[in-house]
Amino acid sequence: SDIRIIRKILDTLTEFNEQGVPVKGTWDTENFFSLQKILPEYAPDIIDKMKERVIKYGDENIIMGYNNGALSAMTEDEFCESINLAITNPDGSGLEDIFGTCEKIVRPQEVMFTPSQVSLYNKLGIKALCLYYSCVPFDAFRTIIPKLSDEEAFNPLTYTYNGESMTIIPTYSNSDVCDAGCLRAW
């Protein structure tokens, strides 16, 4: 199950840290289902370990959106509410509520992106988006920009739409490994 996998990842990261390897996690967890409902009931130890790792090893929490909704399909009000509630909310399941801090970086649900929302991300103080520059066509940033060089494809870049810019952090998925044939070839 996902809970066992997350526990194993947390334990593995901590084992490496204890061996002197400076690894840290970047977590993108939606709030309503995972941080407010499921984990507190079935795996509160995961939240405790994540909190500990934020303090002790510098793990980061980035925004996904409050309720796992498709940010790219939301109205302006829904979009703003989802981002704001993901940061802090009356139920205490915001990233700042739980972890005391969060990075103003968004990895939207299914990494879906709508260029017209760049202005909304900027309005909310979001510093960057993590988007697949990937071979997955339904949610790939790659489909709306010119091909990037290898250097550009593995480093943050600036995306501009209608005069507004923001930083995009290209990310990848297991489908990219499959597209290359194997991890070594990728």
Task: Go through the PLM ranges and name each one.
Residues 32-34, 67-72, 135, 176:
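A short, flexible beta-alpha/helix-coil linker loop
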Residues 110-186:
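Active-site-adjacent pocket scaffolds in enzyme catalytic domains
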Residues 37, 59-77:
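Substrate-binding cleft and catalytic face of glycoside hydrolase catalytic domains
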Residues 69-95, 161-186:
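Alpha-helical scaffold elements lining the catalytic groove of polysaccharide deacetylases
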Residues 1-56, 114, 129, 134:
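Active-site beta->alpha N-cap acidic-glycine motif
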Residues 64, 106, 169:
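Conserved, mostly hydrophobic/aromatic
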Residues 77-123:
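A conserved hydrophobic secondary-structure block that centers on an alpha-helix together
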Residues 19-25, 57-60, 100-103, 124-127, ...:
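Loop/turn elements at helix/coil->beta-strand transitions in domains of secreted/extracellular proteins
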